[in-house]
Amino acid sequence: SIAASVLVLAVRSLGGLQPAELRAYDRLLQQRLPNTTPERLLVIEATEADINRYGYPLPDAVLAQVIERLQPYEPRLIGLDIFRDRPEANSPLAPLLAEQDNLVGLCSGRLGQGDGIAPPPSLPTERLGFSNVVEDHDGVMRRHLLFMTPEVDDPCATEFSLSARLAIQYLDVEGIAPQILPDEQLQLGRAQFAPLQSHSGPYHNLDHWGFQVWLNYADTETFVQQISVSDLLTQNIDLESLENHIVLIGMSAPVSNPTDFFLTPAGANQWPRQQTEGVLLHAQMVNHLLTAALDGQSPIRVWPVGVELVWIAAWCGLGGLVGWRWRRLSMAVIAAGGSVLLLYGIAWGLLNLSWWVPLVPAAIGATLATVGTFASA
């Protein structure tokens, strides 16, 4: 048991188990119990059919029509998830961006060798959010970048992501303001968000720049309504009141705009892999913040490193006990399998309570301890 614990912890400390731990997390995430999400989001998406109809990039006049079509329904906020760094001459969109207080626009921060993308010139900084996201080495979006400090000459001079800007302005109407606590956690309404560190959960030597947290996904089929640009502008769609809604306007055109698609844990578990359009990813991020702040849906949390070590060692001890207790091979195999199933059930149950626990290292350690103890005896 001791040898199994040392071996597993050594391999894990070097990051050798990170890919398997992340894949196990993806699987557990998809198996969680369904959760209900209040209707607060609407996505207006420019589909491939819309691009064929109106052109690419979507003209300012069309975007202005979309915004003006929405305003009578009094949405609390409109987030424009489309870059507009090069305004058209006599653009009807420019005065809307300058004057409509419920309109939030987009830019892209300068990272690494990139140049960044400037915001619309007429948009005030206090209604601006960056589009930058963080993905893991396997390309899957498991983390949520809320804030980052822009460089001095960055054309995207905002510390807020688009999702954080929209959520915080939405919550401001509810009388909720963000607070940074002494332990550097973010207090947002009923929720506290702990920033990821270099060794958080399955991550080892994580580049945790900015303020990153786990992204707690909602059920993809139920959390947001989607309407195409053409349907909004040409059909008699009754949106009723959007008073308590955030409307996101973005692209959903994989041929015309292929770079704005991302791999989520749900898509990574399908074959072939299914990517999600960027506007829906931003909607997931906004929903993540609002459901935590308003509905008490806890952000995903991890144990301190010391508690994880005790957890893994305990399962190694249980595996050793199984190998010592059952001397018939068939019984030892059944008992070891039952232990792993019990471990999986506990990990699943805790993730439903928004706690991630080390499933893979505990399962490997328990199995190695069972085999080693059985063989030595």
Regions found by a protein language model. Give the residues of each.
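Short, well-ordered loop/turn and helix-capping segments at boundaries between secondary-structure elements
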Residues: 291-295, 347, 369, 373
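Pore- and pathway-forming membrane helices of multi-pass small-molecule/ion transporters and channels
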Residues: 273-282, 337-342, 366-367
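Juxtamembrane or sensor-core-proximal signal-transducing alpha helices
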Residues: 360-377
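Substrate-access "cap/lid" subdomains that shape
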Residues: 179-237
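Non-transmembrane functional regions of envelope-associated proteins
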Residues: 1-199, 242-328
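Hydrophobic transmembrane alpha-helices
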Residues: 315-361
